[in-house]
């Protein structure tokens, strides 16, 4: 429903581009002369527009001057259009699009996309927005969908309000500026462009980017809608300048033809005298019918070349803009009343109807009094506006109050007059009865008509409710499809991640097997070393036994020697006493000599004992060093003990053997020293200090050799221990890594399991909401039946009231006294009755005509009622089919999900992928995930962007001279890449051209439904294409 109409002119703005390189090399002159902000002089003639932009104007200045306000208008419920017109290579595409991802060179379309969401985020949080976009081109006078290249020849239809729209065009729901730019990138890749002598990226079609915004206040349920058409027209071409030939020439013919049709439409609207405007001459003018003279606020850019080479084309473009400036549009807010507003309006009309019925009843009562011959006083008459109908009736039934002349007549004539009066009274009563019957019939027909209207209103409400339910179910169905697609994508990515993890696990298993093999080799080496050590220990045991036997023999010899020395020392005199005195003296001398020798030997033994003490002290130092080494060995053994107990036992045995070996070595050295002393004593029996020193040196050398062998053995053992410890550390690190990876995989599996449970809970919640919706529908149906019964009761009471009033009027007419006046009074009564009869006859005829008209209208109303009932049945059938389709899809998706779940349980768990795009509402006060200073986020640099390099070079110079604005800094992180010059003809195709968008507004209607029926059935999907 539209209201708040206001008339406005088309806003026309003129923009001149800089001279390009070819024009500079050719020596073309710069012909425009700018005067102020709204006028330009070409060839001495001034041209005035709403705004004129010189070549050094930046994209931001152009946007703030013309397009920023139209965003607010569209969000306020108006329709808007911005389109660029001009010669080829005049900068139209640069003005409308520019470089999409360059914050300084982006055009009107990407800036509008950013500004729409900035406004929405700052609005009331009770508002909810649904934004959908379409992108199509008019190529060779055929409408081609740029978001689905399979749709190459779409048709233009009209909705129930006779507003043109493109039927079957793909519509995408968006919720962020990035999504709008993605749609533009996708459409631009499919648009027709070519290379001409005047432009490297010449548009070969008219492109139209449509933004449809619907907003609803959640609290008041008030709904507004607005459409914004962003049109980039192809430029008019002169073949002699562009050098077009072949397919490019055919494109130029169609472009010039459609632009000529646009010029004819603007000329007809500018003159204002022609009753026919040729909108249907071109599909472009047909689509833009509302933008040119209709319900829209339109802004037109006329882009011009400043070169003297294009003087004629520039003047023609300026004249076109001046004609367009005189066109008047009537813009109105697209407001849809809520149920509460409809109810208030219905109550207001009901009160008005009630007041009118009361006035009619009073006027009928007053009229009946006048008809009965009563003179109603002015105090009892209806006054003011309420008595307008009674005054009209009174004017038609004047009362004759002329002279009172008394005339005497004969009794026969008197009787004749009385009979005539009775006859007339009888006719009057018959007419009154007939009038009452007709009035009752009229009331019945009016009541039936009111009932039909109420039924029609209720049917319309039910129809709208069913349509809303159907659209809601369709949106839920789309959301369910998106969710299932999301789950399928996540599960597919999960399967891929599982395969990757399986490969990694296999690699780790191979590495672990290699390490196990290496460890087995080390263990085998260690076992061989242990067997070698055991063999050496056995050899050492044999050697120790042999040394023990030698030492025992030496001990026995030493004891015998000591015994012999002792006995000889004691028994020698006894033996000598029985011999000769001389021999005794010799023996005594010999004994004394032996004593002295023994003394020297004892002295030497004492020296040797001192030397032995010193050796014991050195051995204790060595023992302490050995103890520290043994402590270090025990520490390493404690580390090795965690790996194997067997290694500890081996090391412990090794340590005991080393200690036994050291003690035996010390004992052997001591015994060898005593043996040496004994041999020296037996051989020489003379003091030999030099031999003692040699024995001492031999002992020290032997001790040093033992010490070096012991240190070498300790160093070898330390090296082996270090190698084993390093191997143990490496195995521990590998085991820890494998354990961490296993824990990570288990955590991912638990997370996916939780997500699956959440999805199941959400599905149960949706099922519960659907059941509650069905219950509410049944309750509403019962309430409607109750209201219908109450209305029937009121209707019956009204009939009884009308019959009672009619009866009372008849009784009051019968109770009136008969007039017994004279002949004059009788003549007056006769005249009065004749006039009344004539008036009643007229009223009767009028009532008969009204009755006939009502009878004629009754079949039409019944037909409309039947059509409404059939439409309601069709809607119910469509709703039922949609529910059945949704249930089938749900079962099929559930089966697919169960199958994939089984496959995932069979394999393993993975990571969840990114979500698919969902058509969701935009709520003010909730900013997107991207930073406010970087609303476009990180975008792919491969997006195709066609722009005029002249504007880029010229504005780069201008921007170097002037500081960048806040808006340019606002998008400092965005980027764009330009495309190299194309070949002579380029036609970009979409990779997934055969894919159908899930938000496509095509619906599977039954056969025979035309555009109007579709618009009534699906008002949310078939919106007006007004700009």
Swiss-Prot record:
Pfam families recorded: Kinesin (PF00225)
Phosphothreonine PTM sites in chain numbering: 397
Region (Disordered): 906-937
GO biological process, one term: anterograde dendritic transport of neurotransmitter receptor complex
Region forming the signal peptide: none
First-listed, main subcellular location of the protein, grouped into a coarse class: cytoplasm
Positions with a binding annotation for ATP: 86-93
Chain segments annotated as coiled-coil in the UniProt record: 331-906
Subcellular location: Cytoplasm, Perinuclear region; Cytoplasm, Cytoskeleton; Perikaryon
Residues that bear N-acetylalanine: 2
Domain Kinesin motor residues, every copy: 9-327
EC number(s) recorded for this UniProt protein: 5.6.1.3
Region (Globular) residue spans: 907-1027
Catalysed reactions listed for this entry: ATP + H2O + a kinesin associated with a microtubule at position (n) = ADP + phosphate a kinesin associated with a microtubule at position (n+1, toward the plus end)
Annotated GO MF terms: ATP binding; kinesin binding; microtubule binding; microtubule motor activity
Domain of life: Eukaryota
GO cellular component, one term: cytoplasm
Chain positions covered by the region annotation Necessary for interaction with ZFYVE27: 271-361
Family: Belongs to the TRAFAC class myosin-kinesin ATPase superfamily. Kinesin family. Kinesin subfamily.
Free-text domain note: Composed of three structural domains: a large globular N-terminal domain which is responsible for the motor activity of kinesin (it hydrolyzes ATP and binds microtubule), a central alpha-helical coiled coil domain that mediates the heavy chain dimerization; and a small globular C-terminal domain which interacts with other proteins (such as the kinesin light chains), vesicles and membranous organelles.
Subunit structure: Oligomer composed of two heavy chains and two light chains. Interacts with GRIP1. Interacts with FMR1 (via C-terminus); this interaction is increased in a mGluR-dependent manner. Interacts with BORCS5. Interacts with ZFYVE27. Interacts with VAPA, VAPB, SURF4, RAB11A (GDP-bound form), RAB11B (GDP-bound form) and RTN3 in a ZFYVE27-dependent manner. Interacts with BICD2. Interacts with DTNB.
Function, in words: Microtubule-dependent motor required for slow axonal transport of neurofilament proteins (NFH, NFM and NFL). Can induce formation of neurite-like membrane protrusions in non-neuronal cells in a ZFYVE27-dependent manner. The ZFYVE27-KIF5A complex contributes to the vesicular transport of VAPA, VAPB, SURF4, RAB11A, RAB11B and RTN3 proteins in neurons. Required for anterograde axonal transportation of MAPK8IP3/JIP3 which is essential for MAPK8IP3/JIP3 function in axon elongation.
Protein name: Kinesin heavy chain isoform 5A
Lineage summary: Eukaryota, Metazoa, Chordata, Craniata, Vertebrata
Gene: Kif5a
């Amino acid at each position: 429903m539209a209201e708040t109409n206001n008339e406005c002119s088309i806003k026309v703005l003129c923009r001149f581009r800089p001279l390009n390189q070819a024009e500079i090399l050719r020596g073309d002159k710069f012909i425009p002369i700018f005067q102020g902000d709204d006028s330009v002089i070409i060839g001495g003639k001034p041209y005035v527009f709403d705004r004129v932009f010189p070549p050094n104007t930046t994209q931001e200045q152009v946007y703030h001057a013309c397009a920023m306000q139209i965003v607010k208008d569209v969000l306020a419920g108006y329709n808007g259009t911005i389109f660029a017109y001009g010669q080829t290579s005049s900068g139209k595409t640069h003005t409308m699009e520019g470089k999409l991802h360059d914050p300084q060179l982006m055009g009107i379309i990407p800036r509008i996309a950013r500004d729409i969401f900035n406004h929405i985020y700052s609005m009331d949080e009770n508002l909810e927005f649904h934004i959908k976009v379409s992108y199509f081109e008019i190529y060779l006078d055929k409408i081609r969908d740029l978001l689905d290249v399979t749709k190459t020849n779409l048709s233009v239809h009209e909705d129930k309000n006779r507003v043109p729209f493109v039927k079957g065009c793909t519509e995408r729901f968006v919720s962020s500026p990035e999504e709008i730019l993605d749609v533009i990138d996708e459409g631009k890749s499919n648009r027709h462009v070519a290379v001409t002598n005047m432009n490297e990226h010449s548009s070969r079609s008219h492109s139209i980017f449509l933004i449809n915004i619907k907003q609803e206040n959640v609290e008041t349920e008030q709904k507004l809608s607005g459409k914004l058409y962003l049109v980039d027209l192809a430029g008019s071409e002169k073949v002699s300048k562009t050098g077009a030939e072949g397919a490019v020439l055919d494109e130029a013919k169609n472009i010039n033809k459609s632009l000529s049709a646009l010029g004819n439409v603007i000329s007809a609207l500018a003159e204002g005298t022609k009753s026919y405007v040729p909108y249907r001459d071109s599909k472009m003018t047909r689509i833009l019918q509302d933008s040119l003279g209709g319900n829209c606020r339109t802004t037109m850019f006329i882009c011009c070349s400043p070169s003297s080479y294009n003087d004629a084309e520039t003047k023609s473009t300026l004249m076109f803009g001046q004609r367009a400036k005189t066109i008047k549009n009537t813009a109105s807010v697209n407001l849809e009343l809520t149920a509460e507003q409809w109810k208030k309006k219905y109550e207001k009309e009901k009160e008005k109807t009630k007041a009118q019925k009361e006035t009619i009843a009073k006027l009928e009562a007053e009229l009946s009094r006048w008809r009965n011959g009563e003179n109603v006083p002015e105090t009892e008459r209806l006054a003011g506006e309420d008595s307008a109908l009674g005054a009209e009736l009174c004017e038609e039934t004047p009362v004759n109050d002329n002279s009172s002349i008394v005339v005497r007549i004969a009794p026969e004539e008197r009787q004749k007059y009385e009979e005539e009066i009775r006859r007339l009274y009888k006719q009057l009563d018959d007419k009154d009865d007939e009038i009452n019957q007709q009035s009752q019939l009229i009331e019945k027909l009016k009541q039936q008509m009111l009932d039909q209207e109420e039924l029609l209103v209720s049917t319309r409400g039910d129809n709208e409710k069913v349509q809303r339910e159907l659209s809601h179910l369709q949106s839920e169905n789309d959301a369910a499809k998106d969710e299932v697609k999301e789950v399928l994508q996540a599960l597919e990515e999960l399967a891929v991640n599982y395969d990757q993890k399986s490969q990694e696990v296999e690699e780790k298993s191979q590495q672990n097997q290699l390490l196990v093999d290496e460890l087995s080799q080390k263990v085998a080496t260690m076992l061989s070393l242990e067997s070698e050590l055991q063999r050496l220990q056995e050899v050492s045991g044999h050697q120790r036994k042999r040394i023990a036997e030698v030492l025992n023999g030496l001990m026995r010899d030493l004891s015998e020697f000591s015994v012999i020395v002792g006995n000889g020392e004691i028994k020698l005199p006894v033996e000598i006493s029985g011999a000769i005195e001389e021999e005794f003296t010799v023996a005594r001398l010999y004994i004394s000599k032996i004593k002295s020798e023994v003394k020297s030997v004892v002295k030497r033994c004492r020296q040797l004992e001192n030397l032995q003490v010193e050796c014991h002290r050195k051995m204790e130092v060595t023992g302490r060093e050995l103890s520290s080494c043994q402590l270090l060995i025990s520490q390493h053994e404690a580390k090795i003990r965690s790996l194997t107990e067997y290694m500890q036992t081996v090391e412990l045995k090794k340590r005991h053997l080393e200690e036994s070996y050291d003690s035996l070595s010390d004992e052997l050295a001591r015994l060898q020293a005593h043996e040496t002393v004994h041999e020296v004593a037996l051989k020489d029996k003379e003091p030999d200090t030099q031999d003692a020193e040699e024995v001492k040196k031999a002992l020290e050398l032997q001790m040093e050799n033992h010490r070096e062998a012991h240190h070498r053995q300790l160093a070898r053992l330390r090296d082996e221990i270090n190698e084993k410890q390093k191997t143990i550390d490496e195995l521990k690190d590998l085991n820890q890594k494998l354990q961490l990876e296993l824990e990570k995989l288990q955590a991912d599996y638990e997370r996916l399991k939780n997500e699956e449970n959440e999805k199941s809970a959400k599905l149960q919640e949706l099922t519960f909401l659907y059941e509650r919706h069905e219950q509410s529908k049944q309750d509403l149906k019962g309430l409607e039946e109750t209201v219908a019964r109450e209305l029937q009761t009121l209707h019956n009471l009204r009939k009884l009231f009308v019959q009672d009033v009619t009866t009372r009027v008849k009784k009051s007419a019968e109770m009136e006294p008969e007039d017994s006046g004279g002949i004059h009074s009788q003549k007056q009564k006769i005249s009065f009755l004749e006039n009344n009869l004539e008036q009643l006859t007229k009223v009767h005829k009028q009532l008969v005509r009204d009755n006939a008209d009502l009878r004629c209208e009754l079949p039409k109303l019944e037909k409309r009622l039947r059509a409404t009932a059939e439409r309601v049945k069709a809607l119910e059938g469509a709703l039922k089919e949609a529910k059945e389709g949704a249930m089938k899809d749900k079962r099929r998706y559930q089966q697919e999900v169960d199958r994939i779940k089984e496959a995932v349980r069979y394999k393993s768990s993975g990571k969840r992928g990114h979500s698919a795009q969902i058509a969701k509402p935009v709520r003010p006060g909730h900013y997107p995930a991207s930073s406010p200073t970087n609303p476009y986020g990180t975008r792919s640099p491969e997006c195709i962007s066609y722009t005029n390099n002249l504007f880029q070079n010229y504005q780069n110079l201008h921007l170097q001279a002037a500081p960048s604005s806040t808006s340019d800094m606002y998008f400092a992180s965005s980027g764009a890449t330009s495309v190299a010059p194309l070949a002579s003809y380029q036609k970009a195709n979409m990779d997934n051209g055969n894919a159908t968008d899930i938000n496509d507004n095509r619906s599977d209607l039954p056969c025979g439904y035309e555009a109007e029926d579709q618009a009534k059935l699906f008002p949310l999907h078939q919106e007006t294409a007004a700009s």
